[in-house]
Structures are given as structure tokens and as C-alpha cells.
């Protein structure tokens, strides 16, 4: 069939428009590039490898290689659209420096901490790993080993790693990089609702009358979801978009109301809104009386710093998460000081603007969707901020109904599905269970066929504490998978790098590319990427999606799952468990950790015949390992409000939102008629709490740990840009994305640049007491900070901006604040 260029362009345009509208076009109008008859390309589905939106893409493979990707028109999340990163997914696996063999630091043919990297076999790599792990276990016990994982792990990878650490090695020292992005959201959910993850869903975008972005730049960080907000705003004139941030960015271009606030002052703004609702008789008393309780948080709780830090020592209630029941009148009194005058004074936002924002929440006829990500979570009072937003929605009853939604977005493809739901945090188990609860440990031990007392009750080292323990020589064997924490984490010079290079420690990094973290390691293991393996992710709206392996991996790279399971074969149970445990389970004597964890009659119950022919992990182990792990994991949540569908179902659909009960997904949790766990006649049932009520939690404004001073006179905020994802490990290896934004810059207000006698494009030194970086100045463009604040993205490995970030955390969630620290900028002559 011949087609003119004009007809070709029209057909493509029609197909794109139809996909957005959810329309199926006749075959004659489809995109010819996607026609397998013409190109012999094989197409299959997979969730996108990047952010937590959970877009589905169609992956085109040819001759054993990914050659094209496109938005999946059948996907309810993205409806055929992709963002700029998604359109270049086909290139992320083919960087010229892709790692294909294990690399070990060696000198004179033997391992040496100060040696150079040399290729070795997998057997040699695991031999040295096992030697180091066994020596550490014998000398110091299970608290001397640790693992740092990822919200990019597949569900099965995270589950296998957590099981290996907590059941096999009996160490809770496993944490994901989601500690740096979603931990405050988790604790906020648990404190208010007794159960994690959003009650709303993406359908709220088509139902809300007002959108409020609390410190989120969705236009660049969640661009596909931003198109849904844009469509709603432009097609419904009554809809309002509100954007709150410490600097101007692309999301302001759509905003009806923009608010530039002083760092940390979002606490005061949220408390003012609650006060406004009360003072203007906008409380939904029927909802509040039936469905909420009022509580007061302990205050002056410190900043998650080392115990000997003066700021930590000065705190009256360091790290206290205590909640005290109070009356509504006491709650009213607690927010009364936050008048519009006081909120304006603290935040720097005009009084009229604050009142306009409060009115939208207070109007009973306006359905409001609040949205946030890192701006709120990466905050030394991030848990409080999460709860202050819930307070506003609970006071007005604007929750868990279409368009009324406090919605915590996620930044990684499975921060929800793996880090949170699987429980790869140092204190968690699957399905919101925790290691400190003996009943929860008993459930896990029963499912995993462990003797009582196997799982340690004390939470392990969280991400920031892992760095400190490596630095101090307490944590000695450390395995990093699927993240680049040497570039992404805080306070690199003071804590992390010295810990990695501590002669007492042995650091292993699994990665497809030679990242900053890999280059600081002792052993680097090459990993399979994305569709080089089978897996599942869980996105921000509780949607679990699965995909099949579609191409072979490159060289000798292996999946993170393969690495964990193979490593487990290196240990006999006598080498990892004490005699008293073995006496309770003598059947495990002489068996390997692999036998105990994975050849347990559950994980290995599904025969290889059920797997696809292309499934390297399944064929290596001799059974359908992904299905076995998923089904064992799903046992934790079924019947407990975290129900997942059978594994095979996920390969036939574009994901399902849990809880999935009787084959039906759940759109709005806690709402009778939508959530199968909400009791009949309840209206709303916050069943995560024993009394079925949500907590409204009073918490004040408290200042950040550091503020600008005479020497360090500017605020520094770090973050991302549209074209790159996190540390740029994948996106900077895509030529088109690299060319679009090759280098990080420091975005400055022109007046601040003028004061320092620097011009756009000139190189400056950004410094504070923790380090310094050289970077070029940008005074125009997409990001426009106010005077007194600068913004630098962290994707550029040549500009390790996070060296400057203090490792202060929210004391409750242990999540780092990457959004505010003082710096100075000087011109480089």
C-alpha cells in the first residue's frame, strides 16, 4: 500500500488524537510504523521504567533488541501518551558503557580494597562476597551486614531480597531508596488512617474542581498526569489550578493562582487553611463527628541528626511520634494562632492569595484534589505536612469520593508496589506489617515456614543510618541494588563516601552502568534491565502491572532476582542461624538458604511449563519463579485490605488497583460502595484504625535545622528536570535526552547574580561547610527562583550537588530534606 507524506502525517495525527480520547481507529488509519506486517516488529506491553505514574507502553522488538516504544492506547493511565522520557525507552539499555561482566577491585591477581577493577566470573564474584559475608556474620553477627534497595526493584526482586535479609540472614538492615522519597508519605498515611497508600485514584483528575499542588512540579515530574489536569482545566472553565512552591517552574504556566512561599513555611499555610475552615463555619460536622478523632503530635522532635549533634541534643522530644487525644476545642485552639496575617508573615505569600486558596477548600461545592511529591516529603517535618493536608480534607469531608482526594504521588515505578507494599524498609514486612509487632512477625514466620523467633523484632538501620554505620565501621558488608545513592543521597563527603571506602567494609553494587556508586564499590555486578527480565511494578494509584521478558540481556548481566537467589545458595543454614533456631527446625540442617527460602514448596510450586519460553530466571531455576514469589507474597495481603489478583491475570490487563476482591478492583478506598472492606451503612470506614475513624493530627510550624546566614546567604533546593530521571543513569545515555539538557545549571534570580557580579553562562562555585561544586549560571528559562534561593537539579554526575545537602531527616519517617540548606555562591575568576 502506498501513502503520500501528507496522508501519512494525517494518519499519525489521527491515531494520536484518538488515543488521547480513548477511540479505536480502523486499521487503515493506524500508525504504519507500528504495523508488524510492514516492519516485522513484535509488540508487547510493559509499564514504563521511569516514574511512579505507571504509564503502559508498547515495546517493539526486532532481532533480539528493543527498536521502538510507543504509548499504549489501551492503558487507562496514559491513554496512548508518553512523556519525552517514555518515548526514548527503547534506548535506555544500549549505552556504550553498559556493564556486561562482574568487576572486582584487584591487585596482583587478588582482591584489594585499593586495587583497580578487573573482570571476573560470577563464581569468583560470589566467592568473595560469601567469604566477606560469612566472616562478618561470624565476627559481629547479622547487624553487621546490610542491603540498600530500590523503588525500581520489581515486586519479586524486592520480596526475594527482603526475605533473604529478614528470614535468611536474620538482619533487618535492608532499606530502599524510597526512604529518600516516600517514607514521610507512608508514616503520614499510617498515623492518620492506620494503612498505607492513597485512598483516591487517577479518575479523580476528571472529577475535581480545584487542584492544589503542594511543592510539586507535575508539569515536568509527572507530565502525563499533568496532561489530564490540563485537559480538565481547559475543557471546564470553572476549574482552578493552584501551585505552591519555593520557586517558579513550568507548572505555574497553567496555574490560576501561584504561590511562592518561604522554605518550610508550608506548615504555617496548611494550619491557616484549617483555621480558616473552622472560623468560617465550613467544617463538615456530620463527617467529622462520625469519622474522625482529634490528636496532638509531640513537638520539638529534633531533626534526625546524629545523637551528639547540638540541634538533636537540644530537642525536648527527640524522634517522638507520640499522639495524644484531644477535643475539637483543643484542636481549634492549636490552629487559632495561624491567622492569615501570621501565615503571610511566615510564608511571604500575600494575604489575599492565602484567603483565595483557603476558600477553595472551604467551599462545600468545590471538589478538591491535593497533590504532592518530594516538595512535601523531603522535609524535616514531612510527616506533619502530610497530616496537615489530610486534616484539611477530613475537616471538610472532601476525601475518598470522586474528585475529592489528598493524593501523594510517587517518583519511582514501584516505590508503592515494591518498597511500600512488599515492605523492603528496615522496619516493615509485607502488607503494612512491621517487625516490631509480634503478631506480624508470627504471620510472616508462618507464611515463610520459619521457626518462632527467626525475624528480629528490632528495626534495622534506615538509609541515612546505614551511611553513618558504614562510616563508623558498624556495618561492614553492604549490597546496593538498583539505585545510585552516591549521587542521589545527602551529605556524600561527610558520611557516605568515607563509609564506602572504609577499609573494614566490603561494598557490592549491582547496576547496569558504571555509576558514581559503582565506582566507589569493591565489587560491581552487571544487572539485567527492564524487559530483559519478567516482573511487576505497582504505581501511585495502587495499580499493579506485570510484564514478560521480551529480549535477552546483554553479556553476562543477570537480574537482581537471579543475583539474590544465587547468592543464597552460598550459605548453609548452620552458617546463618544460631543453634537454638536450628533445634526448632531440624529439617533445615544441611540445607542452603536458597533451599529454605525458595525451594520451600511455595515459591517453586509452579512448573516451568507455565512460564514463557523467554524467561531466563525461570529456566535457570527450573520453575516459574516470578509467579511463585508473587503468589507467596500475595498471601500476606489477601483478606487484609491489600488483596491482589492471581498473578496470571496481570498479564492479561493493563493493571488492577488493589484491593482486588472477587475479580474487581477498587477505585476509592474507605468509601462504602466502592471499597469492599468498608462496612455496610458506614458511609466511610477508615478500617486501618480499630475504631474505623481517621485521625486529625495537630502539629505546628517549626523552623528548619539550618537557615541562611551572613556567610551562607542563599537557600539551595535540589530536584529534577523533565528530560532526565533521578541521577541520569539511563536518560543521560539517550543521545536525544542528553543533547536536550546536557548539563546541570544553577538557576538564580538575576538580582542575586548581579550582586555577585556573575552573568548567565558563567561558572560559579556553590559551597557550604559540607562541600562545593562548580556549575554554570542560568538566570532565564523554565525555573525562576525568587531572590535568596537557587535551584540545581541532581541528574548530572559531574556536578554532585547533593554533597552540600545536610543529612537531616524527618525524625519520624527518617526521610532526608533535600529542599533547603544554606549555601554561598562566588564567581570563578
UniProtKB/Swiss-Prot annotation:
Its EC number is 1.9.6.1. It is an enzyme of class 1 (oxidoreductase). One of its GO terms (biological process) is cellular respiration. GO terms for molecular function: 4 iron, 4 sulfur cluster binding; electron transfer activity; iron ion binding; molybdenum ion binding; molybdopterin cofactor binding; nitrate reductase (cytochrome) activity. CDD domains: MopB_CT_Nitrate-R-NapA-like, MopB_Nitrate-R-NapA-like. Mo-bis(molybdopterin guanine dinucleotide) binds at residues 85, 152, 177, 181, 214-221, 245-249, 264-266, 374, 378, 484, 510-511, 533, 560, 718-727, 802, 819. Residues 1-29 form the signal peptide. Component of the periplasmic nitrate reductase NapAB complex composed of NapA and NapB. This is Periplasmic nitrate reductase.
Amino acid at each position: 500500500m502506498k501513502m503520500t507524506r501528507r496522508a501519512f502525517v494525517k494518519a499519525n495525527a489521527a491515531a494520536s488524537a484518538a488515543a488521547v480520547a480513548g477511540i479505536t481507529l480502523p486499521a487503515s488509519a493506524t500508525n504504519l510504523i507500528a504495523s508488524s506486517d510492514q516492519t516485522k516488529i513484535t509488540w508487547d506491553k510493559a509499564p514504563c521504567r521511569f516514574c511512579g505514574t505507571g504509564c503502559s507502553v508498547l515495546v517493539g522488538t526486532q532481532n533480539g533488541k528493543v527498536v521502538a516504544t510507543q504509548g499504549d492506547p489501551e492503558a487507562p493511565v496514559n491513554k496512548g501518551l508518553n512523556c519525552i522520557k517514555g518515548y526514548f525507552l527503547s534506548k535506555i539499555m544500549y549505552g556504550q558503557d553498559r556493564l556486561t561482566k562482574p568487576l572486582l577491585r584487584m591487585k596482583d591477581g587478588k582482591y584489594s580494597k585499593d586495587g583497580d577493577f578487573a573482570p571476573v566470573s560470577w563464581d569468583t564474584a560470589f566467592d568473595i562476597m560469601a567469604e566477606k559475608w560469612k566472616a562478618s556474620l561470624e565476627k559481629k553477627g547479622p547487624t553487621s551486614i546490610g542491603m540498600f534497595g530500590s523503588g525500581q526493584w520489581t515486586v519479586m526482586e524486592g520480596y526475594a531480597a527482603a526475605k533473604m535479609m529478614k528470614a535468611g540472614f536474620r538482619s533487618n538492615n535492608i532499606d530502599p531508596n524510597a526512604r529518600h522519597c516516600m517514607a514521610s508519605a507512608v508514616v503520614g498515611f499510617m498515623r492518620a488512617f492506620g494503612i498505607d497508600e492513597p485512598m483516591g485514584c487517577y479518575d479523580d483528575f476528571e472529577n475535581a474542581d480545584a487542584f492544589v499542588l503542594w511543592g510539586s512540579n507535575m508539569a515536568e515530574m509527572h507530565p502525563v498526569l499533568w496532561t489530564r489536569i490540563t485537559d480538565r482545566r481547559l475543557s471546564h472553565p470553572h476549574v482552578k489550578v493552584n501551585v505552591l512552591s519555593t520557586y517558579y517552574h513550568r507548572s505555574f504556566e497553567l496555574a490560576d493562582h501561584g504561590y511562592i512561599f518561604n522554605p518550610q513555611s508550608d506548615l504555617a499555610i496548611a494550619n491557616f487553611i484549617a483555621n480558616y475552615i473552622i472560623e468560617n463555619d465550613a467544617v463538615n460536622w456530620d463527617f467529622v463527628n462520625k469519622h474522625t478523632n482529634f490528636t496532638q503530635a509531640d513537638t520539638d522532635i529534633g531533626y534526625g541528626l546524629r545523637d551528639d549533634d547540638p540541634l538533636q541534643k537540644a530537642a525536648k522530644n527527640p524522634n517522638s511520634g507520640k499522639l495524644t487525644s484531644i477535643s475539637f476545642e483543643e484542636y481549634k485552639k492549636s490552629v487559632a494562632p495561624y491567622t492569615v496575617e501570621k501565615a503571610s508573615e511566615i510564608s511571604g505569600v500575600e494575604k489575599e492569595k492565602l484567603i483565595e486558596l483557603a476558600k477553595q477548600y472551604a467551599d462545600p461545592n468545590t471538589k478538591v484534589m491535593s497533590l504532592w511529591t518530594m516538595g512535601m516529603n523531603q522535609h524535616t517535618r514531612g510527616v506533619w505536612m502530610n497530616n496537615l493536608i489530610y486534616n484539611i480534607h477530613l475537616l471538610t469531608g472532601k476525601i475518598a469520593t470522586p474528585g475529592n482526594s489528598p493524593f501523594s504521588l510517587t517518583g519511582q515505578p514501584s516505590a508503592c508496589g515494591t518498597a511500600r507494599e512488599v515492605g523492603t524498609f528496615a522496619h516493615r514486612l509485607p502488607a503494612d506489617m512491621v517487625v516490631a509487632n509480634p503478631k506480624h512477625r508470627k504471620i510472616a514466620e508462618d507464611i515463610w515456614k520459619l521457626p518462632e523467633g527467626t525475624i528480629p523484632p528490632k528495626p534495622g538501620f534506615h538509609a541515612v543510618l546505614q551511611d553513618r554505620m558504614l562510616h563508623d565501621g558498624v556495618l561492614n558488608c553492604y549490597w546496593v541494588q538498583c539505585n545510585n545513592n552516591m549521587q542521589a543521597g545527602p551529605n556524600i563527603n561527610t558520611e557516605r563516601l568515607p563509609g564506602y571506602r572504609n577499609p573494614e567494609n566490603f561494598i557490592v553494587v549491582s547496576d547496569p552502568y558504571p555509576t558514581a556508586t559503582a565506582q566507589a564499590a569493591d565489587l560491581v555486578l552487571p544487572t539485567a534491565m527492564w524487559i530483559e527480565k519478567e516482573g511487576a511494578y505497582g504505581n501511585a494509584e495502587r495499580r499493579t502491572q506485570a510484564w514478560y521478558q521480551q529480549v535477552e540481556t546483554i553479556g553476562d548481566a543477570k537480574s537482581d532476582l537471579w543475583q539474590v537467589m544465587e547468592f543464597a545458595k552460598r550459605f548453609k543454614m548452620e552458617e546463618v542461624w544460631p543453634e537454638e533456631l536450628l533445634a526448632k527446625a531440624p529439617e533445615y540442617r544441611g540445607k542452603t538458604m536458597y533451599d529454605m527460602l525458595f525451594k520451600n514448596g511455595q515459591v517453586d510450586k509452579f512448573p516451568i511449563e507455565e512460564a514463557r519460553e523467554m524467561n531466563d530466571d525461570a529456566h535457570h531455576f527450573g520453575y516459574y519463579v516470578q509467579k511463585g514469589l508473587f503468589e507467596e507474597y500475595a498471601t500476606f495481603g489477601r483478606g487484609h485490605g491489600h488483596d491482589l489478583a492471581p498473578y496470571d491475570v496481570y498479564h492479561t490487563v493493563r493493571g488492577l488497583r488493589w484491593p482486588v476482591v472477587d475479580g474487581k478492583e477498587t477505585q476509592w478506598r474507605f468509601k462504602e460502595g466502592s471499597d469492599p472492606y468498608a462496612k455496610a451503612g458506614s458511609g466511610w470506614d477508615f478500617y486501618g484504625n480499630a475504631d474505623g475513624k481517621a485521625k486529625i493530627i495537630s502539629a505546628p510550624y517549626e523552623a528548619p535545622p539550618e537557615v541562611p546566614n551572613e556567610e551562607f546567604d542563599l537557600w539551595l533546593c535540589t530536584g529534577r528536570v523533565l528530560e532526565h530521571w533521578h541521577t541520569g543513569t539511563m536518560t543521560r545515555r539517550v543521545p536525544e535526552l542528553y543533547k536536550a539538557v546536557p548539563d546541570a545549571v544553577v538557576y538564580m534570580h538575576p538580582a542575586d547574580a548581579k550582586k555577585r557580579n556573575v552573568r548567565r553562562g558563567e561558572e560559579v562555585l556553590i559551597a557550604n561547610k559540607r562541600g562545593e561544586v562548580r556549575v554554570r549560571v542560568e538566570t532565564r528559562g523554565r525555573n525562576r527562583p525568587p531572590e535568596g534561593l537557587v535551584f540545581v537539579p541532581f541528574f548530572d554526575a559531574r556536578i554532585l550537588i547533593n554533597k552540600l545537602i545536610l543529612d537531616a531527616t524527618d525524625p519520624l519517617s527518617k526521610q532526608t530534606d533535600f529542599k533547603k540548606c544554606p549555601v554561598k555562591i562566588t564567581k570563578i575568576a
